[in-house]
């Protein structure tokens, strides 16, 4: 656990020494398919149970050293610890799942998904997976986020956590590039529309500017710098008044 010892002292159990130039790791393409948030196939192959799928994901990711991480973390006892972890299969599934999430759900849903995910991860770490607060979060994430995650993601894995996403396919994608193009041709989005949107956004910026002037007048921030707002010390104000 000493910080002057790097990942290079580790003999991987699930992966390979991707940092060793003598270890040959050819690039590999892999396609992951999800149905309603559940991983169901790797490279078109389905599996009899979830464990077999994860074991195969471990083998695929492990060939590249995917999912090795060096973590300094906080234990339940409030002491910090440091460890090097391997999770090649989970890393592979996570990359593909997150790609579909960002292509399917809107910004606010994704923000809540990440916030709930962090809370749920903490509860899992504390051994509270079946507590009511965890069940509430799991139900919300499965019902409103995972239920829409159906599709395929193709990646090229190289060395370690070096990869490229090659393709994303889903009938549920809300990302539609043809909606946003401003090139010539049929489009629901024109340069004039963009100008109008920026004009409306500028109204909010104007409101914010007025608030900043109010903050300057009240002494919360200085007009001479762009520093963080400072709340005036009432004791100092009383002394200056005297």
Curated annotation (Swiss-Prot):
GO terms for biological process: argininosuccinate metabolic process; L-arginine biosynthetic process; urea cycle. It catalyses: L-citrulline + L-aspartate + ATP = 2-(N(omega)-L-arginino)succinate + AMP + diphosphate + H(+). Its EC number is 6.3.4.5. Keywords: Amino-acid biosynthesis, Arginine biosynthesis, ATP-binding, Cytoplasm, Ligase, Nucleotide-binding. PANTHER family: ARGININOSUCCINATE SYNTHASE. Homotetramer. This is Argininosuccinate synthase. The gene is argG.
